[in-house]
Design a protein with these regions (language model features):
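Conserved N-terminal Rossmann-fold NAD(P) cofactor-binding segment
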Residues: 6, 31-75, 309-312, 316
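Conserved glycine-rich cofactor-binding loop
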Residues: 15
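N-terminal Rossmann-fold NAD(P) dinucleotide-binding loop
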Residues: 19-20
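Rossmann-like NAD(P)-binding element
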Residues: 55-119
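Rossmann-like NAD(P)(H) cofactor-binding subdomain of soluble oxidoreductases
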Residues: 91-159
């Protein structure tokens, strides 16, 4: 097989459904032959290792461990799904305290064992806040760490494609910004369906509101249908994000990134923005939309600030004014 790089990729939470799918996707896409599977659950990660070995990918060097030092040392790229999954009846925010403690330890391990890592993708919920926690604790630069947000946009894209009976890739500009949660801002003004603006497609306001609701509840719908949280779609999107950071195809769907921007009025949060991920990291631009869309984005930002302040109160991260002491790059 030909590989994009030989650098070490670590999959955290590799014993779970998302983690194991990420391992397989990374190998099928030919990202790197050197992949370390890390999890605290020995039977699970051992089982994934055996299955991946039994796929018989040629030329690969797949290892597994439950030791963080062994896993992280020498890592250049990391994807972490190493948090508790959402269950039926739960919101992403319900996972806040426990998963942010996991994210803090994750960030500490990066700082301790692989400070030279190139890029990190965090996908366990609530992803905006777990990623922010990991960034603060890791000491990394903001452009080196991203969180999963694209899944909300692909859910919106899917819903519109089904609505109008077109191939999904014929729907463009279907993006959500702000938080990866029930307060996400769903933007319609730049959507085109087979090249035609959504505003010209005859979609009623009532139907648009239904599609928005379906998008926001996309993760809950999967849980109801399958009896477990999504794993194929977050795994694939996360692997495509790290592929871009390795120098592969640029990732242009929205990603969660650190924003501290006076002009935009968004300060000290991780949030989904119009972004590009490439070999140099993640870069965001100013969102454009209607007055109503931008107001919903402001509301989403305020919700993210509230969750950020909660983890400060819990002592998981220090007060904002002290972040630079923990991470001079912020």
């Amino acid at each position: 097989m030909n590989f994009l790089t030989n650098d070490k990729l670590v999959i955290v939470g590799a014993g779970g459904m998302i983690g194991s799918n990420m391992v397989q996707s990374a190998l099928m896409l030919g990202l790197t032959p050197n992949i370390c599977l890390y999890d605290i659950f020995v039977p699970g990660v051992h089982g994934v290792f055996d299955e991946i070995q039994q796929c018989a990918f040629p030329g690969v060097n797949v290892t597994y461990t439950v030791n963080p030092e062994e896993a992280f040392t020498g890592a250049k790229y990391i994807i972490s799904s190493g948090g508790a999954p959402r269950k039926e009846g739960m919101t992403r925010e319900d996972l806040l305290k426990g998963n942010c403690k996991i994210a803090a330890e994750f960030g500490d391990n990066i700082k301790k064992y692989c400070p030279e890592v190139e890029h990190v993708v965090v996908i366990f919920n609530p992803a905006d806040v777990t990623a922010l926690t990991a960034l603060i604790h890791s000491g990394l630069k903001p452009n080196q760490l991203t969180s999963l947000a694209a899944l909300d946009s692909t859910r919106l894209q899917q819903a519109l494609a089904l609505e109008f009976g077109v191939q999904q890739d014929k729907v463009t500009g279907a993006h959500t910004y702000g938080g990866h949660g029930e307060q996400m801002a769903v933007f319609a003004s730049l959507v085109k369906v087979d090249g035609k603006p959504l505003a010209e497609m005859g979609l009623s306001d009532e139907r648009w509101e239904e599609i928005k609701h379906h998008t926001v509840q996309g993760g809950s719908n999967i849980i109801k249908l399958r009896g477990r949280s999504s794993f194929q779609s977050p795994a694939y999107n996360a692997v495509k994000m790290i592929e871009a950071a390795m120098g592969g195809e640029k990732f242009t769907l929205p990603a969660g990134c650190y924003v501290n921007h006076d002009k935009l009025g968004f300060k000290n949060v991780m949030m989904a923005m119009p972004t590009t991920i490439d070999k140099t990291g993640v870069h965001f631009t100013e969102p454009t939309g209607t007055e109503e869309e931008l107001a919903s984005l402001q509301k989403s930002y305020e919700h993210l600030c509230k969750m950020r302040d909660e983890i400060v109160e819990l002592g998981i991260v220090p007060p904002v004014a002290e972040w630079k002491e923990m991470n001079p790059n912020l």
